[in-house]
């Protein structure tokens, strides 16, 4: 919406027909997201077979079935070494799990990502995960899909906001293709990536995720990844869900804190960061030697945990080893994702807790605990709940999922200043505020905050009289509106408007020739416009004050709005947020 445009008809949304064009581009991006997911998953399978079974194959095989013995310790080290070299001499953007990097590009990089990232991120992630790295494909596909969306957007004349929409469309389309969870992917965009809730961004993301969801069965398996059907729940499950949520949130906070402590320890090493992933690989290799199921993506392990195929002791061992090697590996700055490891860790917690939690069958608690851990780490409870449902299609679990993720989210919100998603960005000097609300400037109109008493200069005064009366020692304002005898606005003048060579005997009206009037016609505010529109117009044209007129035809001056007036809506907002009062007695 142009800052100079005047809108006479109020609407719920500011979307226009450009939304259709962006949505059409999102269709292409959705298809590309599916292709990118297919390529990434096959890269992971290829490198898994190459590292652990010394074969060139795209077959789905788990690292846990290897027979390498102690040699398995060297594989994550080798993978980390290769990725360190790729990051050093290719692109440093491939380091990390992808989501913070995508957020940084969205908020502070005008949503511009390079082709290098689109190529090197899936390659590096395939190598790391294929060599035993305890990561999932979702972080890399979010970064890769986002890079593809950004690159396609850069082919067109788009605003940074439109590029952001297409970047997020690519990221969420990739996530949809990997997991088959389009609704959860849209919610991830809303809760974590878009930083707004508007049709201009929501609709293209929905389109891209829908296209990815429809095209997914053409290249990947159809249906839920982990089909599950739990039994009905009793009232006692209410208290069990609260406890599971608290413990899931506590585990989330513990892992988040541990991750950045490990990252700080790596930062103190007298070695270039290029070597850190190889050092982290040592811990991964040792952990994988004692607990092979902790290596790699581990989708098969998630299925075993959800279906109760692991005993409590095995689940506890897996939980501890997976958490430790994940924290160390990710803290070393290697390339990987967070969702799949969190699912394993959370499901392991649920398996351990299941014998002591009444109200639901044993399969319910691994599911709700994995969603709780995910909600706590991401700070996205709706995404976590719907994601867990999308993975299993278990309708009986929806209510427990909602409560457990909400409790875990509340726990981490109250106990953690930052999440894994934002801490890295904050350490680079950026502040991210994740609470959204209606802009106070959007809720009040110009006529509610403007000054109704206006000092205006009659156009019939001479230039000399104007300078003497309004721009002499008694000057009050930097600029003044100039009006004709019917109080119709001609324009605004300030001292710099008068040329030193100007004839002081000329009437002030001579300054306002037809060309000037046409150029400045839009530089007014209407009383029915919101303060946000007025603020945008003032910021765009570097103005301190805007004259307020009844309408654009008569241009009759009725007030003036200044920058200081735009503070008034914030006072009302402050009263609503801070002023406590009892209304019923």
Predicted regions span which residues?
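Short, acidic, Ser/Thr-enriched surface-loop or helix-capping motifs
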Residues: 483-485, 549-552
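Tandem CBS (Bateman) regulatory domains
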Residues: 422-455, 462-471, 489-544, 551, ...
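Cytosolic Rossmann-like ligand/nucleotide-binding regulatory domains
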Residues: 476-477, 545
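Alpha-helical transmembrane segments and immediately membrane-proximal extracytoplasmic
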Residues: 1-443, 447, 451-464, 477-480, ...
């Amino acid at each position: 919406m142009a800052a100079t445009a005047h809108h006479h008809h109020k609407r719920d949304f500011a979307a226009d027909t450009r939304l259709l064009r962006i949505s059409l581009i999102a269709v292409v991006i959705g298809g590309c997201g599916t292709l990118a997911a297919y390529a990434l998953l096959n890269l992971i399978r290829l490198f898994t077979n190459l590292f652990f079974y010394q074969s060139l194959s795209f077959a789905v095989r788990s690292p846990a079935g290897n027979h390498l013995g102690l040699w398995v310790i060297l594989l994550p080290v080798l993978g980390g070494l290769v990725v360190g070299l790729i990051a050093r001499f290719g692109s440093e953007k491939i380091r990390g799990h992808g989501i913070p990097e995508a957020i940084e590009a969205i908020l502070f990089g005008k949503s511009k990502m390079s082709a290098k990232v689109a190529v090197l991120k899936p390659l590096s992630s395939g190598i790391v995960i294929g060599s035993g790295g305890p990561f999932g494909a979702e972080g890399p596909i979010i970064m890769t899909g986002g890079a593809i969306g950004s690159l396609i957007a850069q082919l067109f004349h788009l605003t940074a906001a439109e590029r952001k929409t297409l970047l997020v469309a690519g990221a969420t389309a990739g996530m949809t293709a990997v997991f088959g969870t389009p609704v959860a992917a849209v919610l991830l965009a809303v809760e974590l990536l878009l930083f707004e809730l508007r049709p201009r961004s929501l609709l293209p993301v929905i389109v891209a995720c829908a296209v990815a969801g429809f095209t997914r069965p053409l290249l990947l398996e159809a249906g839920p990844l982990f089909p599950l059907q739990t039994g009905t729940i009793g009232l006692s499950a209410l208290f069990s869900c609260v406890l599971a949520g608290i413990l899931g949130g506590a585990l989330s906070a513990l892992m988040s804190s541990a991750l950045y402590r490990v990252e700080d320890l790596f930062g103190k090493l007298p070695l270039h960061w290029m070597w850190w992933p190889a050092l982290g690989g040592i811990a991964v290799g040792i952990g994988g030697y004692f607990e092979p199921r902790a290596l790699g993506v581990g989708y098969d392990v998630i299925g075993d945990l959800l279906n109760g195929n692991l005993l409590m002791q095995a689940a506890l061992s897996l939980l501890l080893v997976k958490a430790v090697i994940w924290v160390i590996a990710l803290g070393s700055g290697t390339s990987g994702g967070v969702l799949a490891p969190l699912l394993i860790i959370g499901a392991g917690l649920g398996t351990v807790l299941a014998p002591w939690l009444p109200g639901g069958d044993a399969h319910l608690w691994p599911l709700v605990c994995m969603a709780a851990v995910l909600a706590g780490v991401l700070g996205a409870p709706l995404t976590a709940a719907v994601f867990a449902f999308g993975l299993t299609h278990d309708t009986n679990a929806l209510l427990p999922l909602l409560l457990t993720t909400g409790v875990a989210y509340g726990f981490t919100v109250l106990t953690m200043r930052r999440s894994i998603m934002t801490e890295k960005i904050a350490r680079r000097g950026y502040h991210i505020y994740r609470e959204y609300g209606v802009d106070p400037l959007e809720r009040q109109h110009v006529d509610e905050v403007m000054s109704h008493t206006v000092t205006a200069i009659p156009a019939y005064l001479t230039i000399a009289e104007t300078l003497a009366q309004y721009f002499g020692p008694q000057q009050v304002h930097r600029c003044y509106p100039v009006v004709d005898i019917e109080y119709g606005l001609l324009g605004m003048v300030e001292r710099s408007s008068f040329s030193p060579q100007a004839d002081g005997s000329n009437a002030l009206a001579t300054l306002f020739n037809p060309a000037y009037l046409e150029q400045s016609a839009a530089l007014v505010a209407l009383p029915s416009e919101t303060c946000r529109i007025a603020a945008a117009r003032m910021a765009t044209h570097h103005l301190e004050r805007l004259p307020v007129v009844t309408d654009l035809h008569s241009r009759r001056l009725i007030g003036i709005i200044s920058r200081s007036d735009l503070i008034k809506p914030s006072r009302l907002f402050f009263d609503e947020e801070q002023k406590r009062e009892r209304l019923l007695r």
